[in-house]
Amino acid sequence: MSTPARRRLMRDFKRLQEDPPTGVSGAPTDNNIMIWNAVIFGPHDTPFEDGTFKLTIEFTEEYPNKPPTVRFVSKVFHPNVYADGGICLDILQNRWSPTYDVSAILTSIQSLLSDPNPNSPANSTAAQLYKENRREYEKRVKACVEQSFID
């Protein structure tokens, strides 16, 4: 069944294949255009470098008027990532716009890895370490990077 959300997701997928952003990829699951698997590669010159972080993206029929639910499947130690993998990112909540597509969502999350917002923490321990003990923060991030090879 073709709906506006499904047609839009097909366009998003086509655009992602034709003009893939650096360091991110995503595709619908085999049998459901409304559920995607994605990968974000850790940005260079950050503690996340060399990591391969898996995510799921779940869309509703209200997409693109409502944002999808995006969750890390891989363990990520980050001030703006909840223990369950949920992501505290303004464009996925109150700053959402129907102009955002899957490519923009993934590149925004990749950018968040590079530039955390410790003032809006989803993980208070990570936020505190990011502000007060950067060496310990980076040590914990690197442990997640190593775990991402196994996941």
From Swiss-Prot:
Disulfide bonds: none annotated. Disruption phenotype: Lethality during the second instar-early third instar larval stages. Mutants show defective synaptic function as a consequence of mitochondrial failure. CDD domains: UBCc_UBE2A_2B. SMART domains: UBCc. The active site is at C88 (glycyl thioester intermediate). GO terms for cellular component: cytoplasm; HULC complex; nucleus. SUPFAM superfamilies: UBC-like. Belongs to the ubiquitin-conjugating enzyme family. This is Ubiquitin-conjugating enzyme E2-17 kDa. The lineage of its organism: Eukaryota, Metazoa, Ecdysozoa, Arthropoda, Hexapoda. The gene is Ubc6.
